[in-house]
């Protein structure tokens, strides 16, 4: 399936998953603990169900590696697969602070390279999507616009940092590079702020899950 067509077919289900997450968010659910000790809620599971069903209907032959399905993590040597995190930023989700820095994420990976990527922050209604062949876009209340990274002024560099993984190595790097301006935010929104030209760099030295 053409990448652009695939993204257009996936966007409605991403929004549906986001709506389900917000419905559950408003009820302030309790968290359970995953196999790795990290939190998981019924919102993670409900969003995953919506996304997996849609992907299987569109591309039944392509395997799906999902954050909430540990068995899928054992799939090895895949040349092509969907990578899904139905609720990235569960810790931010569970703060119920109204900031909304949690996201729904889908990517299609082929030969270790992303072909498409979708990130949706339902609480603030910002939707980002990109494809290797058609560029990067944001959809929000004002419509759809093409996005791009910005040209950095070395004296005004803005770093975006993790709200839950800001370690000493990152702090030292910021000092070493004379970066005094930072914004702290959770989830994959950090990448989106760089991609849309709202920030310049996202330093990450800690472990990163696939």
PLM features: residue spans?
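An extended, acidic
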Residues: 149-210
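Short amphipathic beta-strand/extended segments with alternating polar/hydrophobic composition
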Residues: 130-131, 144-152
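Solvent-exposed strand-loop boundary residues in beta-sheet-rich modules
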Residues: 140-142
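N-terminal subdomain of lithium-sensitive/metallo-dependent phosphomonoesterases centered on the IMPase/IPPase/PAP
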Residues: 1-87, 110, 168, 172-175, ...
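DPxDG-like acidic metal-binding loop motif
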Residues: 76-137
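Short, surface-exposed acidic/glycine-rich loop or hinge patches that mediate macromolecular interfaces
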Residues: 45-46, 98, 164
